[in-house]
Amino acid sequence: MSMMLSNWALSPRYVGQRNLIHCTTLFHTLTRWAKDADDKYHDINSMYENMFTPSNDNVSILQDEGKSDYDTTKASSMEEDISAFNKDLYNFYNIGYAKQIMSASQLENIVKAKGRFVIQSLSTSPYYNLALENYVFKNTPRAKRGPDNCRLLFYINDRCAVIGKNQNLWQEVDLAKLKSKNFELLRRFSGGGTVLHDLGNVNYSYLTSREKFETKFFNKMIIKWLNSLNPELRLDLNERGDIIQDGFKISGSAYKIAGGKAYHHATMLLNADLEQFSGLLEPSLPNNMEWESSGVHSVKSKIKNVGIITPNQFIAVVSERFQKTFKVDGEIPIYYCDEFKSINDEIKDAMNTLQSEQWKYFSGPKFSVKIKDKGLTIKVEKGMIYDCDRNDLIGLEFKGFLENIDSYT
């Protein structure tokens, strides 16, 4: 399958022929270190191997030019080569030299001012990223006249399961499996169903005014942009507004509307470890339990990775098309954040909320559960049993009850 998105990848700077050969020894040393690295560095390792390994033609050219005295086993400017290598590596993975990370005050000034922009978080902390998204949404001013202040946010989270604000987590996830596979559990500030994140999934959040908001709008734009670059992707939209490919769901969405503003945030499965996702959204509860809840229930769907687009390519393509499509007066800038520098008390407070057991386990909708073979009905609100056929269970935490259900029943 041809790769039509390669021009949109984040490319390292040009290195001349002589420097290519100078880097040969350096590269082969560094790739020994890279073998034990995370799989996400596979693409960059391959790219640099092609870049730094001279062909016979290159060596011949240099020799013909009177440079036959060059010894490929020695690097004349090792410090410069290491610096160049690191700079390119950091640029490619958005974690260094080329990315000017905003300070807390810069973030506040930019978010609270009118205007359109793109923000990419360089953090993989789901707590920071959801708190950052919440901060941008709450502090974006409503445009009283002229163009609305539409904004686009990207972030990639480490392993986590994210349930909707109005979901009963006990019906959505297997807590024991999440723990065994080192997945964090989060309850987000918006509605919608449960999704799984890892480093092969990109999250995007499109913010606009309430008047301009339409649930399927931005996903239609993404489909248009990506299909135009590579028609072999064959991306489409289902009736729920999810992006699909060959009948498989590759992107799930959730929405929030408040204060005259709205946002649509969604996942994009690019090269996620889907094997690790297996079973995480299948609660292992006794078969004798019958649930009644007013909360939102996730819709089960077959999922797959897009496969031929990397996270960096996706972010680069969508950012560039967003800049062109939504440009009004002047260029739309791209800013960068992380949890060490681009953080303030409001973001910290939101992170503390997201991390708290109170928010995770003791919020969400009211529900009741009937244990059929015991003739027992339990009613729960804010994580606490408030009504039951047995008085000794009233006032217990439902989490503790479920963890020790055999001793209670």
UniProtKB/Swiss-Prot annotation:
GO cellular component: cytoplasm; mitochondrion
The EC number(s) this enzyme carries: 6.3.1.20
Key words, A-Z: ATP-binding, Ligase, Nucleotide-binding
Domain called BPL/LPL catalytic: residue spans: 146-330
Gene3D superfamilies listed in its UniProt record: Bira Bifunctional Protein, Domain 2 (3.30.930.10)
One function term, GO molecular function aspect: lipoyltransferase activity
Residues the record lists as binding (R)-lipoate: 249
Biological pathway: Protein modification; protein lipoylation via exogenous pathway; protein N(6)-(lipoyl)lysine from lipoate: step 1/2; Protein modification; protein lipoylation via exogenous pathway; protein N(6)-(lipoyl)lysine from lipoate: step 2/2
Protein family according to the UniProt entry: Belongs to the LplA family.
Subunit structure: Monomer.
Protein name: Putative lipoate-protein ligase A
